[in-house]
Swiss-Prot record:
Subunit structure: Interacts with PICK1.
Highest taxon in the source lineage: Eukaryota
Residue positions the entry lists as glycosylated: 98, 301, 454, 484, 569
PANTHER family the record matches: METABOTROPIC GLUTAMATE RECEPTOR (PTHR24060)
Topological domain spans for side Cytoplasmic: 608-624, 672-699, 773-786, 848-912
Gene3D superfamilies xrefs: 3.40.50.2300, GPCR, family 3, nine cysteines domain
Annotated binding of L-glutamate, by residue: 159, 180-182, 230, 312, 405
Organism name: Macaca fascicularis
One Pfam family, short name: NCD3G
Record protein name field: Metabotropic glutamate receptor 4
Higher taxonomy: Eukaryota, Metazoa, Chordata, Craniata, Vertebrata
Length: 912
C-alpha cells in the first residue's frame, strides 16, 4: 500500500474525506476518547485481525428517529451467529492457528443512510491523523484509543445497505461478504468489485419465481417492491426473466416509498384491485413493508383474494405474518437453501445476561423476548409487565426458532476465515501468528483468496463464489399453510438450476388443492384463435374460426383444403362427404317409374308393330321412320338409368352419347315426316310433279343425316374434352360447413348440357315450325295433326324444364332437382310422342281390327287438284275453315288404264 503521506493516496480518498467532514459530528467514535470507554453503538471484540459486521439489530425509525424497534430474529439471531462463528474459528486449532479474529459489529437500523454513517467506523483507522502533536491543557499527551484496523466486513443484510456500504469499502479495498443481500446490481463486478455474497443473486431467485409462476399456470401477475436496490432490482429481474421465458405478463408494478405516507398501503391495495384478474402478487420487499401490505389487504376485506409470492426477504419468517395468518394463507415464498445449525441452537439457548455481556443489545433483546423489565424504575404503575429475574431461559420461557439466514452468516464468517487462512499459509509459511507481509492485510490480495475459497459450510453445503462474487442458486420453496387452526411454512419444492415443485403438497384458501387462477384471459375453446391485446401478450380476445376455417395453432385460423371441411371442434379438417343420386333415393322414384313404364310401353308398341307389320295402319304410318322414332323414344327412356347410375368413365361417356342422341333421333324422324308432308303440299300448289326425296329410302337417308350431325358433335367433344367423372365440392359448398357435400358427377357443365341438348332443341323447334305450317292439310292425312300436337306439348314441357333446371342452380338439392327434372322432361317428351303418335294406332290394331283395312286411295293428282282448288274456292266457302279440301274432291282413281296413261304417285292417306 502506498504511504499515507503520498499525494495520490489522499487524492483517491478525497471524496471520502469530504464525506467525513459532513458526517463528522455523528461519528460513532471520536478522537481523544479515553481508553476503555464502552462503545454503546457497536460491539467491539479485540483480536489479531478485526472483521466488521453490519446487522439490522433495529428496524427503521419513524418521525426523524434513526432506529426503531428491536429485530429479534433478523437482528439478534444473525448477530449472535457471527459471534458464534468467531468463537468456533478462534477455538479451531486447524483454522488460523495462533491468530485470533476480533470484530467490530454495528447496527444498520435497516436504513442505508444510517448504515453509511456507521460504516465510516471501518475506515476510520485508515484516515485518522497522527495525534502525537496534540497536548492537553495540562501540557501532557492525550489518551487516545486507536481504532482497530478492519480487514473485511460481514454484511450487510439489505441490498440497498450493502450497495451504500460497498461504495465506501471499495475505495479502501476492504472486502465485503454479505449473508443476505441478493440484488442483481451487486453482481456488477466493475462497480462492486470488493463485494461477495454467500447467497445467490436475485437473478436466480427471479428465475425460480418465474418458473413457479409458470408451473402454477399463472400468466397475469402484479409486482410490489420496496423502494431501494433490493426491491426494485428484484422486480426488474423478475420482469426481465418473465419476458425472456415468455408467458407471464405484469398487470401492475407498484413501488413502496422509503418513507410511506399515511394511507399509502391502502392505495397500493386499491391499485392492485384495478386488475382483479391478477390475483398473484410478487413481493420483493422488506418484512416491515410486507406486513403493512398484508394489513392493508385485510382492511380492504380482501382476505383470500390475493395469492402472495414472496422473495427471500419473506422466506419462512414469522414476523411478517404474525396475527395476519388468514391474509397470508397460501403465500408461496422462496429462501436460499438452508439447514438449521444445531450447534447454534444450543449456543443461543444458553445465552444469558451473565454470559453474553459482549452483546450490548442482548439486554434489550432479553426484555423484549420475555416481556419483562430489567430496571425496577422502568416499571410503570398499573402495568402488567413484570421485572426480569435473570432466571428466564430462551426456548423454555419463550418461543424460539432459528432465523433463516443464520447459516449464511456463519458461512460468510467462515469464508473470510478460510481466505485469511490460505493467505497466511502462502504469505507467512511456517510462521506463528501474523507476519509483516500480513500486517496490515492487503485487501486486494485478500479478495483473491476469498473468491477462491471452496469448503463445506456449517450445514454441509459447498461454499464457493463465481467471478462476480455470487454464490450458486439453490432455493427451498415454501407455502404458508393453515391446518386445524395452526399455521406453518411447509416445504413444497426446491430450485437448483431448474424447478422441482410438488403441487400436490400445496393448499389454497377456499379451494383446497385446486390451483387458483391468476390469468388475464380465459383459455380459448377449441376452434377459437387468440387475438392478443397490443403490448400485453397474456391478454387476448377469443375469435372463433368461421366458415371452412380450422384452428392451426393458438393464433391462426386457416381454411381447409377445397375437398375438406372443419371438424366439429374446428381443430382439424375432415373429408367432405361425397354424394350422388342413389337408386333408392326418393328423387329417383318418379324418373325410374316413368322410364320403366315408358320402356315397357315402347317395347309393347314395337312388338305390336312388328306383329302387325303388314297391316294397313302400320304401313300407312311409314314403317321405316316409325321404327326409327320408336328407337329414339326407347333411348330417351333408357337415358334415365344412365343419369342415375354412379358416374364413372363409362357412364359419363354413355351420358354424352345418349342424352341428346335419343331426342335427336326422335325429332329427326318427326322433322323428316313433317318436312315430307310440307313439301308434298307445297309442291302440289306449284305443279303436278312429285317432290324429290319422299321415298322411304330418302326419308331414312335424311333422318340419319340429321342424326349424324349430333354424333359428329359428340365425337368432336370427346376429342376436345375427354369424358371423366369429377367430385364437385363447390356445387354444394354451403355457408355452414356441416352441410357441405361433394357431388360426384360427370364433367358436364350447364353450358355443355345446353350445347348437348341444343341440337335436339333445334330439331324440335324446326319440327314445330313445320307442324304449324302443315296444320291445314286435309283430315285424311291424319299424321300431321298428331305430330303438331306432339310438338306443341313437347315445347311446353321443355319451356317448363328451363326455369326449373337453371333456377335451382344455387339450391342445396341441385343435384337431385336437376337430375330429376332433366330425366322427367326427357321421359315426358318421349311419352308425348309415344302416346299421341302410336297409342291410337295400337288401340285400333288391338281393339278395332275392323278399321285396320285399306280405304279409298287417292292419287297425287287428286292431292294436287285439292291443293289447287283450295286456293280457288277459298272465298266460296266450299272448303273448311282450316283450308282442308272436302273429302268429296278426293276420289280414289284406281282405274288401271288411267294409271298407265298418266304419271301418278299412288299412296294412301295414312302414308303421308
Amino acid at each position: 500500500m502506498p504511504g499515507k503521506s503520498g499525494l495520490g493516496w489522499w487524492w483517491a480518498r478525497l471524496p471520502l474525506c469530504l464525506l467525513l467532514s459532513l458526517y463528522g459530528p455523528w461519528m460513532p467514535s471520536s478522537l481523544g476518547k479515553p481508553k476503555g470507554h464502552p462503545h454503546m453503538n457497536s460491539i467491539r471484540i479485540d483480536g489479531d485481525i478485526t472483521l466488521g459486521g453490519l446487522f439490522p439489530v433495529h428496524g427503521r425509525g419513524s418521525e426523524g428517529k434513526a432506529c426503531g424497534e428491536l429485530k429479534k430474529e433478523k437482528g439478534i439471531h444473525r448477530l449472535e451467529a457471527m459471534l458464534f462463528a468467531l468463537d468456533r474459528i478462534n477455538n479451531d486449532p486447524d483454522l488460523l492457528p495462533n491468530i485470533t479474529l476480533g470484530a467490530r459489529i454495528l447496527d444498520t437500523c435497516s436504513r442505508d443512510t444510517h448504515a453509511l454513517e456507521q460504516s465510516l467506523t471501518f475506515v476510520q483507522a485508515l484516515i485518522e491523523k497522527d495525534g502525537t502533536e496534540v497536548r492537553c491543557g495540562s501540557g501532557g499527551p492525550p489518551i487516545i484509543t486507536k481504532p482497530e484496523r478492519v480487514v473485511g466486513v460481514i454484511g450487510a443484510s439489505g441490498s440497498s445497505v450493502s450497495i451504500m456500504v460497498a461504495n465506501i469499502l471499495r475505495l479502501f479495498k476492504i472486502p465485503q461478504i454479505s449473508y443476505a443481500s441478493t440484488a442483481p446490481d451487486l453482481s456488477d463486478n466493475s462497480r462492486y468489485d470488493f463485494f461477495s455474497r454467500v447467497v445467490p443473486s436475485d437473478t436466480y431467485q427471479a428465475q425460480a419465481m418465474v418458473d413457479i409462476v409458470r408451473a402454477l399456470k399463472w400468466n397475469y401477475v402484479s409486482t410490489v417492491a420496496s423502494e431501494g436496490s433490493y426491491g426494485e432490482s428484484g422486480v426488474e429481474a423478475f420482469i426481465q426473466k418473465s419476458r425472456e421465458d415468455g408467458g407471464v405478463c405484469i398487470a401492475q408494478s407498484v413501488k413502496i416509498p422509503r418513507e410511506p405516507k399515511a394511507g399509502e398501503f391502502d392505495k397500493i391495495i386499491r391499485r392492485l384491485l384495478e386488475t382483479s384478474n391478477a390475483r398473484a402478487v410478487i413481493i420483493f420487499a422488506n418484512e416491515d413493508d410486507i406486513r403493512r401490505v398484508l394489513e392493508a389487504a385485510r382492511r380492504a376485506n380482501q382476505t383470500g383474494h390475493f395469492f402472495w409470492m414472496g422473495s427471500d426477504s419473506w422466506g419462512s419468517k414469522i414476523a411478517p405474518v404474525l396475527h395476519l395468518e388468514e391474509v397470508a394463507e397460501g403465500a408461496v415464498t422462496i429462501l436460499p437453501k438452508r439447514m438449521s445449525v444445531r450447534g447454534f441452537d444450543r449456543y443461543f439457548s444458553s445465552r444469558t445476561l451473565d454470559n453474553n455481556r459482549r452483546n450490548i443489545w442482548f439486554a434489550e433483546f432479553w426484555e423484549d423476548n420475555f416481556h419483562c423489565k430489567l430496571s425496577r424504575h422502568a416499571l410503570k404503575k398499573g402495568s402488567h409487565v413484570k421485572k426480569c429475574t435473570n432466571r428466564e431461559r430462551i426456548g423454555q420461557d419463550s418461543a424460539y426458532e432459528q432465523e433463516g439466514k443464520v447459516q449464511f452468516v456463519i458461512d460468510a464468517v467462515y469464508a473470510m476465515g478460510h481466505a485469511l487462512h490460505a493467505m497466511h499459509r502462502d504469505l507467512c509459511p511456517g510462521r506463528v501468528g501474523l507476519c509483516p507481509r500480513m500486517d496490515p492485510v492487503d485487501g486486494t490480495q485478500l479478495l483473491k483468496y476469498i473468491r477462491n475459497v471452496n469448503f463445506s459450510g456449517i450445514a454441509g453445503n459447498p461454499v464457493t463464489f463465481n467471478e462476480n462474487g455470487d454464490a450458486p442458486g439453490r432455493y427451498d420453496i415454501y407455502q404458508y399453510q393453515l391446518r386445524n387452526d395452526s399455521a406453518e411454512y411447509k416445504v413444497i419444492g426446491s430450485w437448483t438450476d431448474h424447478l422441482h415443485l410438488r403441487i400436490e403438497r400445496m393448499h389454497w384458501p377456499g379451494s383446497g388443492q385446486q390451483l387458483p387462477r391468476s390469468i388475464c384471459s380465459l383459455p380459448c375453446q377449441p376452434g377459437e384463435r387468440k387475438k392478443t391485446v397490443k403490448g400485453m401478450p397474456c391478454c387476448w380476445h377469443c375469435e372463433p374460426c368461421t366458415g371452412y376455417q380450422y384452428q392451426v395453432d393458438r393464433y391462426t385460423c386457416k381454411t381447409c383444403p377445397y375437398d375438406m371441411r372443419p371438424t366439429e371442434n374446428r381443430t382439424g379438417c375432415r373429408p367432405i362427404p361425397i354424394i350422388k343420386l342413389e337408386w333408392d333415393s326418393p328423387w329417383a322414384v318418379l324418373p325410374l317409374f316413368l322410364a320403366v313404364v315408358g320402356i315397357a310401353a315402347t317395347l309393347f308398341v314395337v312388338i305390336t308393330f312388328v306383329r302387325y307389320n303388314d297391316t294397313p295402319i302400320v304401313k300407312a304410318s311409314g314403317r321405316e321412320l316409325s321404327y326409327v322414332l320408336l328407337a329414339g323414344i326407347f333411348l330417351c327412356y333408357a337415358t334415365t338409368f344412365l343419369m342415375i347410375a354412379e358416374p364413372d368413365l363409362g357412364t359419363c361417356s354413355l351420358r354424352r352419347i345418349f342424352l341428346g342422341l335419343g331426342m335427336s333421333i326422335s325429332y329427326a324422324a318427326l322433322l323428316t315426316k313433317t318436312n315430307r308432308i310440307y313439301r308434298i303440299f307445297e309442291q302440289g300448289k306449284r305443279s303436278v310433279s312429285a317432290p324429290r326425296f319422299i321415298s322411304p329410302a330418302s326419308q331414312l337417308a335424311i333422318t340419319f343425316s340429321l342424326i349424324s350431325l349430333q354424333l359428329l358433335g359428340i365425337c368432336v367433344w370427346f376429342v376436345v374434352d375427354p369424358s371423366h367423372s369429377v367430385v364437385d365440392f363447390q356445387d354444394q359448398r354451403t355457408l355452414d360447413p356441416r352441410f357441405a357435400r361433394g357431388v360426384l358427377k360427370c364433367d358436364i357443365s350447364d353450358l355443355s348440357l345446353i350445347c348437348l341438348l341444343g341440337y335436339s332443341m333445334l330439331l324440335m323447334v324446326t319440327c314445330t315450325v313445320y307442324a304449324i305450317k302443315t296444320r291445314g292439310v286435309p283430315e285424311t292425312f291424319n299424321e300431321a295433326k298428331p305430330i303438331g300436337f306432339t310438338m306443341y306439348t313437347t315445347c311446353i314441357v321443355w319451356l317448363a324444364f328451363i326455369p326449373i333446371f337453371f333456377g335451382t342452380s344455387q339450391s342445396a338439392d341441385k343435384l337431385y332437382i336437376q337430375t330429376t327434372t332433366l330425366t322427367v322432361s326427357v321421359s315426358l317428351s318421349a311419352s308425348v310422342s309415344l302416346g299421341m303418335l302410336y297409342m291410337p294406332k295400337v288401340y285400333i290394331i288391338l281393339f278395332h281390327p275392323e278399321q285396320n283395312v285399306p280405304k279409298r286411295k287417292r292419287s297425287l293428282k287428286a292431292v294436287v287438284t285439292a291443293a289447287t282448288m283450295s286456293n280457288k274456292f277459298t272465298q266460296k266457302g266450299n272448303f273448311r275453315p282450316n283450308g282442308e279440301a272436302k273429302s268429296e274432291l278426293c276420289e280414289n282413281l284406281e282405274a288401271p288404264a288411267l294409271a298407265t296413261k298418266q304419271t301418278y304417285v299412288t299412296y294412301t292417306n295414312h302414308a303421308i
